[in-house]
Amino acid sequence: MCNCKIPVLLVVFAVFSGFVQAQEIQRSKGHFSGSLETNWGFYMKDDKLGVKKVEDKVATNTYLTLGYSFKAFRFGLEYDIYEPPMIGFSPEWEGCKLMRGFAEWTGKSLELRAGTVYEQFGSGLIFRTYEERALGINNALMGGNIRWRPWDGVTLKVVAGVPQKFQEYAPVRIYGTDGEIDLGSLLFPENGMLLSVGGYWVLRDDRSDEHNVKADRVVRNYAGRLDLSKGIFSLGGEYVAKSRSLYWDDAYNIRYGKGRNVLLYAGIDAPGIGFSATFRAFENGDLRVDDCLNDESV
């Protein structure tokens, strides 16, 4: 357990908040921002429930976020404290560390980001980096991200980095690119139809000690998608093909093989009534940080 002084941290944040308010007057010098989320659990013995001993009577999940923006530039830092993690969260989170930070520049058609990357390709069947504090999930990449819109209706994305695994970054490399074209706006600008096609490629290069020598170190994923909407009707789908990797079968045996994901959906959104239908099929369809199969959160 690291020696974090949380009360001192709260005082520092309060002082910083006052500084932020003072800086609001000087908008030409940029804009500071900050947030503090702190969650606490207090635990005690309960003979009726059979809880005879409590290892940690107090636990906290605390997150301090600081940001600064100036014209087209944005910068951010996030400091996490799990002293220790609250019950229900993996003990792998224990500790306190400055885990995430980023620098970002946004232009008219181009966005560049270095540091912590949160991104999603398509519907997120294979590639989605996100933070869900309530569930103890954060699989952000530490690397780089490019978003480019060379023409109206055309979007290209590129990501590269190493994924976060609890309080460390895994010795794994993730590379990916995604492209989408809005054919509706390009071919039928006056029709009001949305017709977009897209696809992406994601590669995971597992260089960790968790890598199983019987499995390929490199896992490749290819996907295509289609979205169509007109008036009250919408439909679409996405298909993902995955190269060979380890996975659990229905009997919890470790298998090795290719995978695929299929997502189809349709909907009607009329005044006073709505209808939607979704079909999903998954076969070895997830992409984990590494070949360690015993933790669902990574």
Language model features with spans:
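N-terminal secretory signal peptides that target proteins for export/translocation
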Residues: 1-4
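Bacterial N-terminal signal peptides
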Residues: 7-18
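Signature for the C-terminal beta-barrel architecture of outer-membrane proteins
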Residues: 24-32, 37, 41-60, 69-75, ...
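Phosphate/ribose-recognition catalytic cores of enzymes acting on nucleotide-derived substrates
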Residues: 100
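Conserved, mostly hydrophobic/aromatic
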Residues: 114
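Extended assembly-interface regions of large multimeric machines
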Residues: 118-120
